[in-house]
């Protein structure tokens, strides 16, 4: 069994430490923040300023791999997650009745919850785990590195105090200092592939009133205009978030910080209006997030690993813009794989690097492609032109066969080519279009003139 040092106590760090500990490894988790999540979710969510983790207060939808990994590795955490208020939503719940079951349909489940609920459940489990020692308020300041070809990381430093480890896991997040430490230690530099995402997010949180309306009706959770996306994230404990997405260069972005302006703009989208009409209680200010990139940080190159005794996971490895909701899912998948292969990874990380390239890199590439297209479309207010692609998206909400394909892609279970390019899906979309010869791709949100008038008040 390996001695493992995990740097960073976010979702990926907690999940990695817990899964390693339950496999019998001796784990020390270092987290520079002295505070940890507890049982008061609203206090921790609405009143904990966490500038290093801007995504902590942004809305989340936890995709199928989150549920699958938790049920397989830590079923008690999954039970606790539901007990704390997370809710399961099956993609076929959109329909009055689920279609006849096919293999894999049981995986098409989104967990509707705030990130803090998962963090609280993982934190509680880590506290109970005797093989995991958490050192809060202890900032890792460097690595201990032994010479070799390649060099070997032998532990971490906390101030002047060394801590030996057979394997160090960098889960310090998108601002991880580890790549710079490796270069300073004389290692070949990590290979970084970074793409700026020209997309900005603004959200506001609400809570349904106990004595008020609770059902928005049968309405999609997403709407769009040529220059903006809008959506609602139903969440735990009667909370929901309204979310707007624009180009970072949109001149109206700053005005949306005003709650009155934000809500007026959000009401121009059917998805948001249906929920705002429930007269829910606002629970937060308007929360912006921008300045993001998609970044892949490989600790290996064409000559092999740049170092042994160290791997990265979570946002330290793959940081993706949140439009597709991949972050938590990919972080827990990596934690599961690492826990199952810790001893061999400590000896030689080549297998882990190969797995991340094969299993996770395609998701990164898909996010980059999606964000490039979205950023250009939002910046240019481009109209929809691909009739069949628009029909595929619309048809999913009428046809369970197409919804299944859509859900398989969304939940990272199949690639778009695998899910959509089948004879069955093609036949169903063709029939849907034939029944709607007048169908034209369109947006359900405001025009630019309407939007500008709303922002101007």
What are these model-derived regions, one by one?
Residues 61-62, 105-124, 177:
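Short beta-strand to alpha-helix junction loop
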Residues 252-358, 362-363:
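FAD/FMN-dependent oxidoreductases across multiple families
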Residues 97-115, 245-249:
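Helix-loop-beta segment of a Rossmann-like dinucleotide-binding subdomain
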Residues 339-457:
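C-terminal helical "tail/cap" subdomain of flavin- and related membrane-associated enzymes
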Residues 19, 40-95:
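N-terminal FAD cofactor-binding segment of flavoenzymes
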Residues 2-39:
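N-terminal Rossmann-like FAD-binding beta1-loop-alpha1 element of flavoenzymes
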Residues 128-265:
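Predominantly flavin-linked oxidoreductase catalytic cores and closely associated redox partners
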Residues 28, 133-135, 311:
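General small-molecule cofactor/ligand-binding pocket signal
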């Amino acid at each position: 069994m390996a001695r493992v040092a995990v740097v960073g106590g976010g979702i990926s760090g907690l999940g990695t430490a817990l899964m390693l500990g339950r496999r019998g490894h001796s784990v020390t988790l270092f987290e520079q923040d002295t505070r940890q999540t507890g049982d008061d979710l609203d206090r921790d969510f609405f009143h904990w300023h966490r500038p290093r983790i801007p995504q902590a207060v942004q809305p989340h939808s936890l995709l199928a791999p989150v549920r699958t990994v938790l049920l397989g590795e830590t079923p008690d955490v999954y039970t606790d997650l539901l007990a704390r208020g997370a809710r399961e939503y099956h993609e076929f719940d959109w329909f009055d009745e689920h279609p006849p079951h096919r293999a894999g349909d049981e995986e098409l489940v989104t967990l509707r919850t705030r990130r803090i609920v998962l963090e609280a459940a993982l934190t509680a489990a880590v506290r109970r785990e005797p093989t995991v020692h958490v050192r809060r308020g202890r900032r890792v300041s460097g690595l201990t590195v032994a010479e070799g070809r390649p060099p070997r990381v032998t532990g971490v430093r906390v101030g002047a105090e060394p801590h030996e480890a057979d394997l160090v896991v960098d889960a310090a997040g998108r601002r991880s200092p580890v790549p710079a430490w490796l270069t300073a230690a004389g290692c070949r530099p990590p290979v970084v592939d970074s793409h700026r995402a020209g997309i900005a997010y603004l959200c506001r949180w609400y809570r349904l009133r106990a004595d008020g309306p609770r059902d928005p009706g049968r309405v999609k959770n997403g709407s769009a205009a040529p220059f903006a996306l809008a959506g609602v994230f139903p969440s735990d404990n009667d909370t929901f978030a309204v979310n707007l997405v624009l180009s970072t260069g949109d001149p109206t972005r700053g005005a949306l910080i005003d709650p009155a302006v934000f809500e007026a703009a959000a009401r121009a989208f059917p998805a948001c209006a249906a929920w705002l009409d429930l007269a829910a209680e606002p629970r937060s200010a308007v929360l912006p997030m921008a300045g993001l990139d998609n970044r892949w940080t490989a600790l290996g190159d064409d000559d092999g690993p740049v170092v042994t005794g160290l791997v990265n996971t979570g946002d330290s490895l793959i940081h993706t813009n949140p439009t597709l909701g991949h972050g938590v899912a990919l972080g827990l998948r990596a934690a599961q794989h690492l826990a199952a292969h810790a001893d061999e990874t400590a000896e030689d990380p080549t297998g882990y690097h190969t797995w991340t390239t094969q299993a996770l890199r395609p998701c990164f590439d898909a996010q980059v492609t999606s964000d490039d297209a979205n950023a250009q479309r939002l910046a240019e207010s481009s109209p929809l032109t691909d009739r069949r692609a628009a029909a595929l998206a619309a048809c999913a909400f009428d046809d369970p066969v197409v919804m299944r394909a859509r859900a398989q892609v969304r939940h990272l279970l199949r690639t778009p080519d695998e899910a959509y390019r089948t004879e069955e899906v093609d036949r169903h979309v063709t029939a849907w279009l034939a029944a709607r010869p007048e169908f034209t791709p369109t947006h359900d949100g405001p025009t630019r003139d309407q939007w500008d008038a709303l922002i101007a008040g």
